[in-house]
Amino acid sequence: MKLTCVMIIAVLFLTAWTFATADDSGNGLENLFSKAHHEMKNPKASKLNKRCTQSGELCDVIDPDCCNNFCIIFFCI
């Protein structure tokens, strides 16, 4: 019983901590929902539809979009 109470309190604390330290730039949840709504209207804008760069293709070192996330000297490995 005590362990259950401790676990519940820990989960509540971590949830509150997550919301307290979350990056709330701009409108917070309102901004998130409007972005999701835009992605539903325009499926091509969704990040899930972006193709990853295959091994041996050119990539960006700063923001790699390689399928395995390894970009060395402008090439995915």
Curated annotation (Swiss-Prot):
Positions of the propeptide removed during maturation: 23-50
Signal sequence, start to end: 1-22
Keyword Signal included in the entry's annotation: yes
Disulphide bridges, residue numbers: 52-67, 59-71, 66-76
Gene Ontology CC: extracellular region; host cell presynaptic membrane
GO molecular function, one term: calcium channel regulator activity
InterPro entries: Conotoxin
Record's comment describing the protein's domains: The presence of a 'disulfide through disulfide knot' structurally defines this protein as a knottin. The cysteine framework is VI/VII (C-C-CC-C-C).
The protein, known as: Omega-conotoxin-like Ai6.2
Taxonomic placement: Eukaryota, Metazoa, Spiralia, Lophotrochozoa, Mollusca
